[in-house]
Every structure is written in C-alpha cells, then in structure tokens.
C-alpha cells in the first residue's frame, strides 16, 4: 500500500461525495455531488473544509513520491432523481436522458443516465473535471461507463483538460450498464461482451 500522511491508497478510494446509507456494498459509484470530496473518509472532522484540505494533502503526498493521481469519476449517472438529485432539483429532468415515454433512461443500470448531450450538462461536466484538475491537481481521469458519453463529448472533455496539462491521462470503460440511445451508431467504441475481463 502507498502510505501518505492521511492514510493508505485503499483509504483514499471513493473520495467523491456519494449518497449511500448502507456502505457495506458500495464503492462510491452512487454520486450525489460531483464536485465535493466524500466527508466520511475525513480524519477528525472539525469543520467543513477538512475534507477538501485532507484530500489536497493526500494528493500532494502522492505527488511528492512521484505518484500520479488518477481519479475514478462517475458522470454517467447519479445516486437518485427527482427530489433525490441536486441536479433534478435545479433543472427538472434536464440533466438526464429520458425515454420516449418520458421516463428516465437507464443505460447505466443504476436507474438513470446523465444527458451529456445537453449543452449545459456537458459544460458542467467539463467544469467539474477542470475543478478537480486545477483545484486538487488530479493528473487524469478514469470514466466509469464511458460508453454512455458521446464520442464528441469525450473529445471535448479531453481537449479542455489537455489545455491545463498536455500530459493528462483520460480513459474509461467503453461500455454501458444497459441499453442506451447514445450507443446507436457507435459500435466501434462499445464491447458486446456479457462479462468483460479487461481484454478487447
């Protein structure tokens, strides 16, 4: 394990704020807010800035050891919808893809999928990525279910990050968790393997 002044690598995983009461089976893949560190990993929480301060300290400690920090990000779905989503409460149903009956599309297999094809959602994701890179000095991003993001959106994400750091690393899972409208016509970027084992 890589050890820092704020803990080990294993303690650092799942650092984005996620909504989950039962943490017995959760790796932080139910994001509630994309832009805040998960406060449950904070040591001796005394004020609201402890989560951000300790995360920055941890990343700095990794960098001092020559270790790049790749953040596992989940921009393909959120922990909830409606009153369970800060995004739905801000702009009802705008942040999510809807099916032809007006229901939440579920290409993530988690109850919803984020509409990165909507201009303001795409801009918000780019701003979020830039926030993590500029304010926390993240070196790269691994996208969960990247197959739910349009190729053009991923290109724009990369270009925005490349402007900050030409050495940025961006990669992700080239599949979705279910059937999605975004996958139509993108067979070259998706895997049709029922149980991907990391080989393509």
What are the roles of these predicted feature ranges?
Residues 29, 139, 145-200:
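Active-site-proximal helices and loops of the catalytic beta/alpha 8
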């Amino acid at each position: 394990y890589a050890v820092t002044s704020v803990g080990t690598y294993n303690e650092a995983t799942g650092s984005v704020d996620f909504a989950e009461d039962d943490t017995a089976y959760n790796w932080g893949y139910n994001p509630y807010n994309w832009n805040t560190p998960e406060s449950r990993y904070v040591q001796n929480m005394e004020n609201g800035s402890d989560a951000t301060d300790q995360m920055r300290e941890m990343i700095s400690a990794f960098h001092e050891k020559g270790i790049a920090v790749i953040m596992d990000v989940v921009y393909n779905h959120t922990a909830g919808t409606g009153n369970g989503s800060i995004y739905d409460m801000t702009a009802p149903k705008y942040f999510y893809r809807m099916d032809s009956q007006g229901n939440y599309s579920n290409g993530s297999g988690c109850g919803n999928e984020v509409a990165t094809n909507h201009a303001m959602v795409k801009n918000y994701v780019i701003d979020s990525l830039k926030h993590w890179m500029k304010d926390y000095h993240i070196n790269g991003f691994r996208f969960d279910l990247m197959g739910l993001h349009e190729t053009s959106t991923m290109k724009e994400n990369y270009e925005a990050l490349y402007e900050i750091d030409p050495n940025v690393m961006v990669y992700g899972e080239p599949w979705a968790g279910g059937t999605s409208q975004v996958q139509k016509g993108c067979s070259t970027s998706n895997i049709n393997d029922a149980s991907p084992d990391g080989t393509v």
